[in-house]
Amino acid sequence: MPTEKRQRQKEGRAARQAALQAYRRKAARRRQLITGVAVFAVVVLILVLLQRGKDNGQNVTAGSSTTAQGTTATTAAPAGKVGSSPCPPADGAAPRKIAFDGEPSPCIDPSKTYTAKFETDVGTFTVALNAKQAPKTVNNFVFLTRYHFYDGVKFHRVIPGFVVQGGDAAKGDGTGDAGYKFADELPKSVDEYKAGSLAMANSGPNTNGSQFFIVVSDAGGKQLQKPLYSLFGQVTEGLDVVQKIEADGTPQGQPKVLHQMVKVTITET
């Protein structure tokens, strides 16, 4: 009898051990399933955020024909829709305005010369605007500048050797614009982009708004590969100031230091 009792105890222990191991295997499978679902959810979330970033960022891209257009809180007016805001006075007396219901009506005289002076937190640089080659784009820039649109706006995207980008007064992170789009005025060749070139950021044909970029080197101009961005100006003085801003950029575009346009003014002669 003692032998049979020990045998039953042994069998009981074996059964309990087997049940425990089965439970542990089941629990491990459950944890793996939960972990797999969680990982899948995280991957989906990342993909959604990346896609949202593509949809909302207005970035010029090296080595690519694609860019991403920012959206404001309101739907941007399509290219060709003229807004209701009048041409601001040339003396800078207009109050600041950063949201519009359509592109500007003609406010400049293409036969005249227009110069933009950028006062930044690290110095001043000057750009000669090319109203003959890009009258619509220069008109847009002069219009926004005379409404003080760019005053205090940061250079939110800076890539060393490539571009310094700014012009988002609405959100400040590259996902905003002035509330409208307008048509392209493209150069004939990518060779026209060079150190100091001023061009518009976009998300494809005829999606210009308020954001622009400055090419920081001739090699940076070559990275654009195709003439897909409206070219409307050239830095004539203070390229070293632009390069100071460039120096605080990163390969990913997020600046180590956020520099800003303190004030931008237009001279007409």
Features from the language model and the residues they span:
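Cyclophilin-like peptidyl-prolyl cis-trans isomerases
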Residues: M1-T269
